[in-house]
Amino acid sequence: MGHPPLEFSDCYLDSPDFRERLKCYEQELERTNKFIKDVIKDGNALISAMRNYSSAVQKFSQTLQSFQFDFIGDTLTDDEINIAESFKEFAELLNEVENERMMMVHNASDLLIKPLENFRKEQIGFTKERKKKFEKDGERFYSLLDRHLHLSSKKKESQLQEADLQVDKERHNFFESSLDYVYQIQEVQESKKFNIVEPVLAFLHSLFISNSLTVELTQDFLPYKQQLQLSLQNTRNHFSSTREEMEELKKRMKEAPQTCKLPGQPTIEGYLYTQEKWALGISWVKYYCQYEKETKTLTMTPMEQKPGAKQGPLDLTLKYCVRRKTESIDKRFCFDIETNERPGTITLQALSEANRRLWMEAMDGKEPIYHSPITKQQEMELNEVGFKFVRKCINIIETKGIKTEGLYRTVGSNIQVQKLLNAFFDPKCPGDVDFHNSDWDIKTITSSLKFYLRNLSEPVMTYRLHKELVSAAKSDNLDYRLGAIHSLVYKLPEKNREMLELLIRHLVNVCEHSKENLMTPSNMGVIFGPTLMRAQEDTVAAMMNIKFQNIVVEILIEHFGKIYLGPPEESAAPPVPPPRVTARRHKPITISKRLLRERTVFYTSSLDESEDEIQHQTPNGTITSSIEPPKPPQHPKLPIQRSGETDPGRKSPSRPILDGKLEPCPEVDVGKLVSRLQDGGTKITPKATNGPMPGSGPTKTPSFHIKRPAPRPLAHHKEGDADSFSKVRPPGEKPTIIRPPVRPPDPPCRAATPQKPEPKPDIVAGNAGEITSSVVASRTRFFETASRKTGSSQGRLPGDES
């Protein structure tokens, strides 16, 4: 509800109606004063909460950054390196977000609190002082008027004239106070519209700018998040594969602990008790014994040290070993040995009957050799029947089930697998099995193929080359990694290399249908790494290298065409691709090392500065405003480039070949587009940088046209200059994961007709005089372009983009 204006003429009359209207203004002024106090109070609470929140986030990021992953083994995979660096990347991202927020919080008091407090104290407080003066002068005037009216007419003329002058003077003072008070209260009533709203607007502007920077960082984070999710999934797959092998190893160790021997360790070792004869009788002394069969050396370390004497290990050379007859001694599990260093016989006591058998077997004792309690499955050979079996399995899989989801991952029935293998490898009629029979489904055939390969007497990639292949996969030099594996493949025996080529060619065909069967090279590596490669010893250390076996198979699949194109060049060292300026090494994915964005200038200027429009002299001599009206944000389409050669480091054969047509895609697919951009996608054309490509969806114009913060500084380029828009990488080079210099495309609209872009206002000499020069218009333009650096447009027309 509006208030009637206070006329200056009413100040002289000072009527009851005037006083009533003035009282309404005073009540509104008091309500405004209370409102400003509440805004200041709640604003301080909000700023304090934001500061506390930012401090908590920074403390959280410090906690993340302080943690360092430890690992088992001597080398991490590429995916594990990405995971190990992830907390540091998270902390850097959180710190960047909170640094922007703290800048906004630091300026919030100057933007919101101080202007409101100044208005309340200076304007409203000054109005209250005017009110006090008005009331004081009015009280004095009416009091004097009452006394003046009670003067008797019989007073002297000089006294009456003096009294009249005094009343006129007080009336004049009261009238001036009334005019000043009415002017001031109406001025505050009108000026509060912008003096209160402008600080809140500036505060919201800085708040939304900070939020928009958070949105930009979220877009930067999207491709990193998807790459890290892929690394996490790959690592989880490696873990599942390793866990299965570790469980099998633990199971075997429970059944026969002595069957697993580490390389470089003694043939057998453990605790034995030795019979020692003394003058006062016989004692049994505990020793830790280690026996090396090749040199027949028995090392005995005493466990019970005699007081005052430090005994070291004793090395003895074994001559022979024989089991002690049970009736000849009252102790169990005993056997005798004879050595070159000691005369006579040494009687040893094992811990159990099984333990004595193992010691005697290792020492070639005069007792029947007891075999290991583990009964191995019947080993299969890499012969003609095996090749025939593998070819038949591959043919039926590629004919009937290559698009089956989870191919090779889904396990078939063990009964059916054994039935198929027994029928095919029957010595009476080997290979006489009809794979088209309905009894053999795809899961049974794939499981049978894996079972055959795992139970070969020697793995396809041999024990001899196992360490070299794992060592090559551990290298951080991607070129050496590929070259070394290429060289080692041609060191395999002929039939092994033929079988490996047959299998890898089949796996490449499977991966080409990964959209249907979901089996990527990484997934196939997890399945066939332990199948084609196997350490000779069953140890935990060997199990921890399974993930590198998976990487070897993954590289064979991804670079099948290069590896099997021919043997590498003859040289002492493994061949590597053509030399580069710097070696192409794996680098962990990162978002913290990208280019710094141009920092947005928050609104911190005084209101007086905003009233003057920034003007400059154009080349034709016309004075124009350098502040442009706001333009709706245009989101350019994300360009995709195609390199001439594929990346030999990570390219999947199942990746579809992109054409030059850029299709619209939703926001969730941005990470895929970015990864294609970095791995090599479609080539940039000038049309792609100047406007939407044919077939692309219409640009979605937001309903709220807020100016987004300027992107990270780029090299100046003209429209249509593709080279300045995207730098072409050398073939195969893998950059760090950074966000491309343009915004990702918006989701396409449902409407078929494209929206017409709003025309740019061209400010030229002919219409320069039509620009509104009012204070309101200048302030409006100032706030709409508060994030623009005013100095960047000097020396050119506002509409010039070149």
From Swiss-Prot:
<dbReference type="InterPro" id="IPR001849">
    <property type="entry name" value="PH_domain"/>
</dbReference>
<dbReference type="Pfam" id="PF00169">
    <property type="entry name" value="PH"/>
</dbReference>
<feature type="region of interest" description="Disordered">
    <location>
        <begin position="783"/>
        <end position="802"/>
    </location>
</feature>
<dbReference type="GO" id="GO:0035255">
    <property type="term" value="F:ionotropic glutamate receptor binding"/>
</dbReference>
<dbReference type="GO" id="GO:0048667">
    <property type="term" value="P:cell morphogenesis involved in neuron differentiation"/>
</dbReference>
<dbReference type="GO" id="GO:0015629">
    <property type="term" value="C:actin cytoskeleton"/>
</dbReference>
<dbReference type="Pfam" id="PF16746">
    <property type="entry name" value="BAR_3"/>
</dbReference>
<dbReference type="GO" id="GO:0007165">
    <property type="term" value="P:signal transduction"/>
</dbReference>
<feature type="compositionally biased region" description="Polar residues">
    <location>
        <begin position="616"/>
        <end position="627"/>
    </location>
</feature>
<keyword id="KW-0966">Cell projection</keyword>
<dbReference type="GO" id="GO:0098880">
    <property type="term" value="P:maintenance of postsynaptic specialization structure"/>
</dbReference>
<keyword id="KW-0225">Disease variant</keyword>
<keyword id="KW-0254">Endocytosis</keyword>
<dbReference type="GO" id="GO:0035023">
    <property type="term" value="P:regulation of Rho protein signal transduction"/>
</dbReference>
<dbReference type="GO" id="GO:0031175">
    <property type="term" value="P:neuron projection development"/>
</dbReference>
<dbReference type="GO" id="GO:0005543">
    <property type="term" value="F:phospholipid binding"/>
</dbReference>
<dbReference type="GO" id="GO:1900242">
    <property type="term" value="P:regulation of synaptic vesicle endocytosis"/>
</dbReference>
<comment type="subunit">
    <text>Interacts with HOMER1. Interacts with AMPA receptor complexes. Interacts with SH3GL2 (endophilin-A1). Interacts (via C-terminus) with NR1D1.</text>
</comment>
<dbReference type="InterPro" id="IPR047267">
    <property type="entry name" value="OPHN1_BAR"/>
</dbReference>
<dbReference type="GO" id="GO:0030182">
    <property type="term" value="P:neuron differentiation"/>
</dbReference>
<feature type="domain" description="PH">
    <location>
        <begin position="265"/>
        <end position="368"/>
    </location>
</feature>
<dbReference type="GO" id="GO:0006930">
    <property type="term" value="P:substrate-dependent cell migration, cell extension"/>
</dbReference>
<dbReference type="InterPro" id="IPR027267">
    <property type="entry name" value="AH/BAR_dom_sf"/>
</dbReference>
<dbReference type="GO" id="GO:0043197">
    <property type="term" value="C:dendritic spine"/>
</dbReference>
<dbReference type="GO" id="GO:0030036">
    <property type="term" value="P:actin cytoskeleton organization"/>
</dbReference>
<keyword id="KW-0963">Cytoplasm</keyword>
<dbReference type="GO" id="GO:0021895">
    <property type="term" value="P:cerebral cortex neuron differentiation"/>
</dbReference>
<dbReference type="GO" id="GO:0048488">
    <property type="term" value="P:synaptic vesicle endocytosis"/>
</dbReference>
<keyword id="KW-0524">Neurogenesis</keyword>
<dbReference type="Pfam" id="PF00620">
    <property type="entry name" value="RhoGAP"/>
</dbReference>
<protein>
    <recommendedName>
        <fullName>Oligophrenin-1</fullName>
    </recommendedName>
</protein>
<keyword id="KW-0343">GTPase activation</keyword>
<dbReference type="GO" id="GO:0021707">
    <property type="term" value="P:cerebellar granule cell differentiation"/>
</dbReference>
<dbReference type="GO" id="GO:0098978">
    <property type="term" value="C:glutamatergic synapse"/>
</dbReference>
<dbReference type="InterPro" id="IPR011993">
    <property type="entry name" value="PH-like_dom_sf"/>
</dbReference>
<dbReference type="GO" id="GO:0007399">
    <property type="term" value="P:nervous system development"/>
</dbReference>
<feature type="region of interest" description="Disordered">
    <location>
        <begin position="569"/>
        <end position="588"/>
    </location>
</feature>
<dbReference type="GO" id="GO:0005737">
    <property type="term" value="C:cytoplasm"/>
</dbReference>
<dbReference type="GO" id="GO:0005096">
    <property type="term" value="F:GTPase activator activity"/>
</dbReference>
<dbReference type="GO" id="GO:0030100">
    <property type="term" value="P:regulation of endocytosis"/>
</dbReference>
<feature type="region of interest" description="Disordered">
    <location>
        <begin position="607"/>
        <end position="666"/>
    </location>
</feature>
<feature type="domain" description="Rho-GAP">
    <location>
        <begin position="380"/>
        <end position="564"/>
    </location>
</feature>
